[in-house]
Amino acid sequence: MARRALPGIDCVEASIGHPSGPPEWKPNPSDTQVIFHQIIDWSDAYANAPNIPGGDRWPAAWVQPAQAYRDALQAGARAMLDISYGERARNRFDLFSPEGRPKGLVVFVHGGFWKALDKSFWSHLARGSVESGYAVAMPSYTLCPEARIAEITREIGAAIARAAAMVEGPLFLTGHSAGGHLVTRMISATSPLPDDVRARISHTVSISGLHDLRPLIKAAMNAELHIDEAEARVESPALLAPMQNARVTCWVGSAERPEFVRQNALLANIWTGLGAKTCVIEEPGRHHFDVIDGLADSDHQLTRTLLSP
């Protein structure tokens, strides 16, 4: 796993220890780091809002800044909304353009556990990349339970291919939570993307991504997701090989639920051994809902990392 010096942010490798000795074995805190992972309630493990002070403010807190950004870019003829990429009602994406010719294309895939929200909540997060000279596409997709996760994977592949046909240059993929799963799925060996589109992908940043779907089978939300063991095995990036020359940064807030921190390190740990260039970043003090805020700022390390060559 690559280590990169980022001002104020540590790019770290996971260090997970498990006691293997008799019951009386105790670690020496002076030279041993031991992290125990024991989860009894998988629904609580993924419950963000109840575990964030004021967490009930989201997602409503994103609506106004997203609308204001869309309005501003529409006024300058730099926003194309509801571009079709498929036949289903939610197969639409918005495209935001910089002033002048784009240097390339960023695609942001939203979260919501594959079952909630749409592209309209996140428009303001395009600002950092747009101000850096890149076009930004933000797709919606059919939600669970109307669609299975495997279908959503194919839809995101179609959205990226359509957007890539409209904007020349390198591609940068990023997504949050379920969106982190979907963008890393795009750079797995079984990606639905055409070869020519895959070849253009320069960097992928999974923000608080869910890379192993198997634990979600045990969560209450699976009543809507309908994940089974078979689907989890073919749709979990951590259980798949990365595509050739994959480069991925796994980014998470240090104040997130421990399960998101674990899932964040998980993909980088596994894909490093399979030949991918990987990095793990825990942004100090960030929780699940504000960890994405840096995308709105061209000078923030999250945007700079995403667009790094």
Report the location of each language-model feature.
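The feature captures the conserved acid-bearing segment of alpha/beta-hydrolase catalytic domains
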Residues: 203, 217, 229-265
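C-terminal catalytic histidine-bearing segment of alpha/beta-hydrolase fold enzymes
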Residues: 265, 272-309
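Short, surface-exposed "cap/lid" segments of acyl-processing enzymes
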Residues: 99-128
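Catalytic nucleophile-loop/oxyanion-hole region of alpha/beta-hydrolase
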Residues: 117-126, 137-172
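Primarily recognizes the serine-hydrolase "nucleophile elbow" in alpha/beta-hydrolase
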Residues: 158-220
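N-terminal cap/lid segment of alpha/beta-hydrolase-fold proteins
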Residues: 48-100
